[in-house]
Amino acid sequence: MPRVVGVARAKELILTGRVLAADEAERIGLVSSVVPAGEARAAADEIATEIAARGPVAVREAKRLVDLASDVDLATGLAAELDASDRVFATDDMLEGAEAFFAKREPQYRGR
């Protein structure tokens, strides 16, 4: 929590036990979005569908890099991004994505 909202705000929330309203949690970056009651599953499914439409190798690498970024210095993070780019650009999915873009069609990623 301190990395997301800062040390002072994290201490305030944790030590007071204050409950945040959804809009405040979104405003301070504690949650990425707020949806109306009863619509959380549909909103999550929509995000999952968007992610699933992307190249699985690229998604996996992006997820790994985001997780890594909070634990390493800038130089290490940039080196990891360069290595990941090399891996992603060497995939069949990268070629499929480029071909689909120029053909103005949806890509058919295979995770290779």
Language model features: what each stretch is:
Residues 1-30, 45-51:
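Conserved catalytic cores of soluble enzyme domains
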Residues 9, 61, 81-84, 97:
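Hydrophobic alpha-helical segments typical of transmembrane helices
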Residues 13-17, 62-65, 101:
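Short alpha-helical scaffolding segments that buttress acidic/His motifs in well-ordered protein cores
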Residues 22, 31-79, 86-87, 92, ...:
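C-terminal long alpha-helix characteristic of the crotonase
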Residues 93-94, 100:
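Interdomain hinge/lid region at the active-site interface
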Residues 99-112:
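Terminal low-complexity tails and localization/encapsulation signals of metabolic enzymes
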